[in-house]
Structures are given as structure tokens and as C-alpha cells.
Amino acid sequence: MELSSLTAVSPVDGRYGDKVSALRGIFSEYGLLKFRVQVEVRWLQKLAAHAAIKEVPAFAADAIGYLDAIVASFSEEDAARIKTIERTTNHDVKAVEYFLKEKVAEIPELHAVSEFIHFACTSEDINNLSHALMLKTARDEVILPYWRQLIDGIKDLAVQYRDIPLLSRTHGQPATPSTIGKEMANVAYRMERQYRQLNQVEILGKINGAVGNYNAHIAAYPEVDWHQFSEEFVTSLGIQWNPYTTQIEPHDYIAELFDCVARFNTILIDFDRDVWGYIALNHFKQKTIAGEIGSSTMPHKVNPIDFENSEGNLGLSNAVLQHLASKLPVSRWQRDLTDSTVLRNLGVGIGYALIAYQSTLKGVSKLEVNRDHLLDELDHNWEVLAEPIQTVMRRYGIEKPYEKLKELTRGKRVDAEGMKQFIDGLALPEEEKARLKAMTPANYIGRAITMVDELK
């Protein structure tokens, strides 16, 4: 079978392939090879720019332009050529080195220094920087923009429904009212914290040889300050430098990055489930789309499929991300190869998350508050005013306020008239009685509206 969306084993590349297209140029085999080529070329250019490395003279402008073009115009055909070479070498990074030697063979100035391609490097020098560039690109260009869309979409709901009262539920039972907007603001605030934290994760890299001590570098050029050279090179790629490593960059930052993504995903699962529940309670209605079918046998169904799809894919995403976060920082002695196959799945966890983000955004776009139902539900739960009444009774020293309200309301339905009669019988100042009698389940919402307005 030819590989296609119909024959792909993973639904990430199959059924949902169109939803993860933004990740293909980053996390695919092509993407990894593209970043490896970039690192190898920039390393050669860095060597040529150092006066003490006389065997690699400073490149002429044409040679620099030629090397830059190899990086900028790296194509699928180039990637395919590397894979062809790899069939002989059985070593993926060495195949990149040989590919570059082929590319520079026609330029005498570059051909003369071709043995300095991959100079003093271990494969992991190239790989760790390539993975760092992959993750930085994905974070900055894909993940954070999607997070911003989600946060802004939920903030829009908060503002739109800032004053729509909602009967809260704790333990699934009626509780002190809030507003739809305030509940959305709670989620947006949590997400904003994770957004800031993800943006602040230091993406690290190293280029220091087989065990992190520049052994081969110093053997060849003892007069060069390779530690400084390494720092300059890594930071020139837009990556933070890690000066202390074994053969591998220890991947702690990947754990930090993915733990943060998993936390955001968990917050989104919480949101998906809450909205699913609000739809089930008829608090939200869903806009219907012509032609869509909710059930193969029940024609009336309008299911919350977007939030269900999101929840399921977020679970898969977190399973992958959390495994990566716990596995990658552990490597035997100066390195073992267990991280290699795991690192090839960086895009899988992000891919499932991306599918989920788009599903939630679609679901949010179809939500409409069922205002009449919300008000009706509040009107059938006057017992929630037991809280403010007993609290005011405490202020004025009335004996056993909690117990009296418990006797009136626990396990019972109390209407507006019953509450007013109870208030009239209390030894309270008349202005306090009037204030309490003006309260309804729909307006007993505390600072909910103000807190939405204060959300940044």
C-alpha cells in the first residue's frame, strides 16, 4: 500500500493529518534532517570565522552564500538523498555529513575544507541542537499561538457572559451562584500562567564532544578556548547554552517544556469536561451545522463531539508527553541509546495536543448560553440564599444561625416567599432585612462581574 491518509497507521498522520500540517516541517524526518544540516553548516562557518583555526581560512562571500543557500533551500529531494546515503552508512548523522561533502564538492574553496564538516563533533552534538531548534520552533510558531487563540476565545466567553448568573455546583449539588463569565475567567487565568511559564522555559543545547569535555577539540587545537567557542556557537542559534553535560544534553529542559504543555492540557481537559456538563444541563446550547449528523439512529442528537474529541486527544497527548518528561532525563553513565528512539516521538505528543486545541476552538465557536434555563434553575433553588442569611445573622449575634438555616433548607425546596417569611422573623435591623429580601439566587453573585472586568 502507498502511504496516505487512508493507509497511515497513526491517526495523527491519517484521519487528522490536515490538522497537524503545521508540524510536518518541524517534527518529521525531513524536519530533523533540515535542522541537522543547519547545525552542521553553521558549525563549519563558525570554524572558518576563528583566526586560530588556520586550516579553515575565512570563507569568501560567495562560499558563505553557497552554504547559506544549502540551509535555506533544503528540499525534500535533499532529504531523500540523505536517506539514500543512510542505507549504506546505517548511520543517520554520518549520512548528513556525507551529503554535505557531496554538496560542497563542486566549490573548490569548500571542498578543500570538507573534512572539517562535523569536526570534533559527536552525533549528539548535532542532534541535541537540532531537537532544540525543533522544539523552539514548535513552541514559538505553533504551540503558543494556539494557546493564545484558546485563551482569547475563553476570555471572549468570559466578557460576553460576564453577568449571566449560574447556579454553581459543588459535589454536583446546588451551591452559591456565580456567573458564566466568572467561570470562564477562572480557566483563562489558569491558562495564562502556563502560557507565561512555557514562554520562559530555557531551551538548552551543547556542543562539547563525546563526553562533554572537548577532548578531541583540545587535542587538535589546544590554543582555542573551546568552552567559549561552544557558548558562542550555541547561543548564535538562539538556544541557551548548557556548559555541563555528558555525551548528551541531559534533556531536563524537555521535561520542563512538556510538563508545562501537559499542565495546560490538563486545564483544557477540565474545561472540556465542564462545558460538556453545562451542555448536558442545558446551560449551553450548540449551534447546529447543516448536514451534520449526531447519531446514526437518533436524528435529534446534537452531541458535544468537539469537546469529547478534544478530551480524548489531550489524554493521548499527555500520555506521550509525560513519558518523554520522565524518561528523557535518565541516561546510563555518559549516555545510552534509549533516548534516541523516544526523541523521534517529540511531534507525536504535540500532534495529539494540536488536534485537541482545534476541536476545543471549534466547540467554543458553537456555544450559545441558554439564559432562560439558567434563570429558571436559579429560581428553583432559593435555598442557596441560606449562606448569606446565616452569615448576616452571625454579624448581629443571633443564636445558632447556621443550625436554623440548616433546619429550614437542608434537603428541602424553599421558594422566595418562604425565604422572605424567615427573614421577617429575624431580630435584624429593618435595613438589613430589606437588603436580604432584595437578594435573589440570580443576583447573589458577589464580585463575579467585577472579577471578569479585572481579568487581564
UniProtKB/Swiss-Prot annotation:
Gene Ontology cellular-component terms listed: cytosol
Keyword Lyase among record annotations: yes
InterPro entries: Fumarase/histidase_N, Fumarate_lyase_CS, Fumarate_lyase_fam, Fumarate_lyase_N, L-Aspartase-like, Pur_lyase, PurB_bact, PurB_C
EC numbers, comma separated: 4.3.2.2
Induction: Its expression is under the control of the transcriptional repressor PurR.
Pfam families, sorted: ASL_C (PF08328), Lyase_1 (PF00206)
GO-annotated molecular function: (S)-2-(5-amino-1-(5-phospho-D-ribosyl)imidazole-4-carboxamido) succinate lyase (fumarate-forming) activity; guanosine tetraphosphate binding; N6-(1,2-dicarboxyethyl)AMP AMP-lyase (fumarate-forming) activity
Record field: catalytic activity: N(6)-(1,2-dicarboxyethyl)-AMP = fumarate + AMP; (2S)-2-[5-amino-1-(5-phospho-beta-D-ribosyl)imidazole-4-carboxamido]succinate = 5-amino-1-(5-phospho-beta-D-ribosyl)imidazole-4-carboxamide + fumarate; (2S)-2-amino-2'-deoxyadenylo-succinate = dZMP + fumarate
Modified positions (N6-acetyllysine) in chain numbering: K94, K366
Enzyme class at the top of the EC tree: lyase
Residues forming the catalytic site: H171, S295
Amino acids binding fumarate: H91, T122, S123, Q247, S296, K301, V302, N303
Pathway: Purine metabolism; AMP biosynthesis via de novo pathway; AMP from IMP: step 2/2; Purine metabolism; IMP biosynthesis via de novo pathway; 5-amino-1-(5-phospho-D-ribosyl)imidazole-4-carboxamide from 5-amino-1-(5-phospho-D-ribosyl)imidazole-4-carboxylate: step 2/2; Purine metabolism
Entry binding sites for N(6)-(1,2-dicarboxyethyl)-AMP: 15-16, 90-92, 122-123, 247, 296, 301-303, 309, 335, 340-344
A GO biological-process term: 'de novo' AMP biosynthetic process
Domain of life: Bacteria
Residues bound to AMP: R15, Y16, N90, H91, D92, Q247, N309, R335, S340, T341, V342, L343, R344
CDD domains, per the entry: PurB
Keywords: Acetylation, Lyase, Purine biosynthesis
Signal peptide location: none
Effect of H171 to A/N: Reduces catalytic activity about 500-fold
Family: Belongs to the lyase 1 family. Adenylosuccinate lyase subfamily.
Subunit note: Homotetramer. Residues from neighboring subunits contribute catalytic and substrate-binding residues to each active site.
Known role: Catalyzes two reactions in de novo purine nucleotide biosynthesis. Catalyzes the breakdown of 5-aminoimidazole- (N-succinylocarboxamide) ribotide (SAICAR or 2-[5-amino-1-(5-phospho-beta-D-ribosyl)imidazole-4-carboxamido]succinate) to 5-aminoimidazole-4-carboxamide ribotide (AICAR or 5-amino-1-(5-phospho-beta-D-ribosyl)imidazole-4-carboxamide) and fumarate, and of adenylosuccinate (ADS or N(6)-(1,2-dicarboxyethyl)-AMP) to adenosine monophosphate (AMP) and fumarate.
Protein name: Adenylosuccinate lyase
Encoding gene, per UniProt annotation: purB
